[in-house]
Amino acid sequence: MCQSRYLLFLATLALLNHLSLARVIPVSGPARCLSQSRNLLKTTDDMVKTAREKLKHYSCTAEDIDHEDITRDQTSTLKTCLPLELHKNESCLATRETSSTTRGSCLPPQKTSLMMTLCLGSIYEDLKMYQTEFQAINAALQNHNHQQIILDKGMLVAIDELMQSLNHNGETLRQKPPVGEADPYRVKMKLCILLHAFSTRVVTINRVMGYLSSA
């Protein structure tokens, strides 16, 4: 009986020690960024599904819409976020980039490189552009009395959280002025176009964060 109590006591101590270690060991920056990007991927996919269901009369499917990339000629995510072995001339590409780069807490020291720093800076700019557009569209949607659809708050929060992790300069984001009396049909069609383009970009972002958090 005494031996059983002693073993139970040891097991309790071991469990308490394990829980204590779990509390004090911080989550690494790259792991947190991966978790945030996965959450963004999920909330974006959910928002795309919601838009397809609620805007089914607006041809809001990937097959029907006119695809438009608002980041085209503005950022270089697709070039800078290629695997390092595919970059033929890193220094040449870097000279064409702006000197202001953002990496925040997502880039681990062992994977630090000029291209990955530029990659994360470009991802940050992507998110900033989409966040600005989504805020303007959401304001326009909320101005419509029937409110057929509005953007999911979870997706907007997920964008903001990942941007905060990427933003080590503490940049204050400027919100785009709300759209005035915009045509409801045009606003909803633009929403469909943006959501599909954004969901594609989020897949790329999630892959980058997965690479950075891998051993």
From Swiss-Prot:
> Which residues does the annotation flag as glycosylated?
89
Protein keywords: Cytokine, Disulfide bond, Glycoprotein, Growth factor, Secreted, Signal
- Show which residues constitute the signal peptide: 1-22
Listed Gene3D superfamilies: 1.20.1250.10
MF (Gene Ontology): cytokine activity; growth factor activity; interleukin-12 beta subunit binding; interleukin-12 receptor binding
Source species, domain of life: Eukaryota
GO cellular component: a single term: endosome lumen
How does inactivating the gene affect the organism?
Deletion mutant mice display normal development. However, they are unable to restrict the progression of Leishmania major infection with strong parasite load in lymphoid tissues observed. In addition, regulatory T-cells are functionally defective and mice are unable to control colitis (resembling inflammatory bowel disease, IBD).
Q: Where in the cell is it found?
A: Secreted
InterPro entries registered for this protein in UniProt: 4_helix_cytokine-like_core (IPR009079), IL-12 (IPR050676), IL-12_alpha (IPR004281)
Q: List the disulfide bonds.
A: 33-106, 60-192, 81-119
Which BP terms from GO are recorded? cell population proliferation; cellular response to lipopolysaccharide; defense response to protozoan; immune response; positive regulation of T cell differentiation; positive regulation of T cell proliferation; positive regulation of type II interferon production; T cell proliferation
Similarity remark: Belongs to the IL-6 superfamily.
Cite the record's note on assembly.
Heterodimer with IL12B; disulfide-linked. This heterodimer is known as interleukin IL-12. Heterodimer with EBI3/IL27B; not disulfide-linked. This heterodimer is known as interleukin IL-35. Interacts with NBR1; this interaction promotes IL-12 secretion.
Its biological purpose is as follows: Heterodimerizes with IL12B to form the IL-12 cytokine or with EBI3/IL27B to form the IL-35 cytokine. IL-12 is primarily produced by professional antigen-presenting cells (APCs) such as B-cells and dendritic cells (DCs) as well as macrophages and granulocytes and regulates T-cell and natural killer-cell responses, induces the production of interferon-gamma (IFN-gamma), favors the differentiation of T-helper 1 (Th1) cells and is an important link between innate resistance and adaptive immunity.
Q: This protein is called what?
A: Interleukin-12 subunit alpha
Q: Which source organism does the UniProt entry give? A: Mus musculus
Q: Which gene encodes it?
A: Il12a
